[in-house]
Regions:
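Short amphipathic alpha-helix that is part of the acyltransferase structural core
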Residues: 1-31, 142-177
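Conserved donor-binding loop and adjoining core beta-sheet/short helix segment
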Residues: 4-7, 18, 24, 32-99, ...
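A conserved beta-strand-loop-helix scaffold within acyl/acetyltransferase catalytic domains
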Residues: 35, 69-72, 179-226
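Acyl-donor-binding surface of acyltransferase catalytic domains
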Residues: 63, 70-149, 285
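Conserved acetyl-CoA-binding loop-helix of GNAT-fold acetyltransferases
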Residues: 84-95, 227-229, 233-250, 269-273
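Conserved GNAT acetyl-CoA-binding A-motif
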Residues: 100-110, 248-260
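Conserved beta-strand-loop-alpha-helix junction that forms the acyl-donor binding cleft
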Residues: 107-113, 258-268, 285-290
Length: 290
């Protein structure tokens, strides 16, 4: 097995893009990241590829394992064609440790992430915990029976009177209160600057939001789904996500993709009613300091 660490995003992109595209919906995060890095237009925050860890494991014929970490975020992994190879995985772990790369966490298809975590934790002499069990869904057609409520429109700067609170609420729901207390006006404006954040209004009152967060070759990603607690249980999230998903399909994408937290059965049920179908389970694992 050969461990190759890359310093050039364009080289890494050329070697791995087609492999990741074999499971495009599953790989929306690493694919989206290497597209951002390859374009090089946006180097804010974690998007500067000069700070990334990028590696592949190959045998005599081909790449067996692809790894990319957009520091300081988690490591993401893809076993080519979802064929987990324990020797390849341990070669990656050995290469990471030899090169003194520190991994805060890993997020990947469940069985692969668990294999990596076990090997990495043992060899580092550290502990790990499961941060989130997730499911990846894709949709090719919106259920026409979903009721349409109110009006869905693009968010504007005028919405900054409430959007920071909604985004903090979203972060709190997804990542916990400890990671939802920060944030600046510039950060919130950035999250709506690409004109893909949508607001559902009912009788002129903003009640829910969702965003088309990434464009890939044939799929777009729906995320940042949030309804304030006061407005929950009224069908707003269902209507908003259905409308935004249809916007994505209308733009020419063949599928919409989203991640869900398996600890929230209500949201999983909502998405399946809209027409989303599960394609694989993903897990996020965090490591203790080593």
């Amino acid at each position: 097995m050969n461990f190759t660490q890359y310093s050039d995003i364009k080289h890494f992109y050329m070697d791995t893009y087609d492999l990741l595209m074999r499971h495009e919906a599953q790989n929306v995060i690493p694919l989206g990241n290497i597209i951002i890095g390859n374009e090089g237009k946006d180097k804010t925050d974690w998007r500067d590829s000069a700070n990334w860890f990028m590696a592949t494991i190959t045998d005599d014929k081909s790449i067996l394992l692809t790894a990319v970490m957009t520091t300081p975020k988690n490591l993401t992994l893809y076993a080519t064609d979802n064929k987990n190879d324990n020797i390849a995985l341990n070669s990656l772990v050995d290469g990471i440790i030899k090169n003194d790369i520190h991994i805060p966490g890993v997020m990947a298809e469940k069985s692969l992430a668990e294999m990596f975590a076990q090997s990495y934790a043992v060899k580092r002499g550290i502990e790990y915990t499961v941060a989130k069990n997730q499911r990846i869904y894709e949709l090719s057609q919106v259920n026409v029976e979903i009721p349409s409520i109110g009006t869905v429109r693009l968010a504007t700067k005028k919405d900054m009177s409430f959007l920071p609170y909604w985004m903090k609420g979203f972060d709190s729901d997804c990542f916990g209160d400890s990671l939802a207390t920060g944030g600046s006006t510039d950060n919130y404006l950035y999250r709506m600057s690409d004109n893909r954040l949508y607001i559902l209004e009912d009788n002129g009152m903003p009640v829910s939001m969702a965003k088309i967060s990434r464009d890939l070759q044939t799929v777009c990603v729906v995320g940042l789904v949030y309804t304030p607690p006061y407005f929950r249980g009224k069908g707003y999230a269902t209507s908003c996500v259905a409308a935004v998903s249809q916007f994505g399909l209308d733009r020419g994408f063949t599928k919409c993709v989203l991640y869900t937290d398996l600890a929230n059965p209500i949201s999983n049920s909502i998405y399946m009613k809209i027409g989303y179908k599960p394609i694989c389970d993903s897990i996020e694992i965090k490591f203790s300091e080593d």
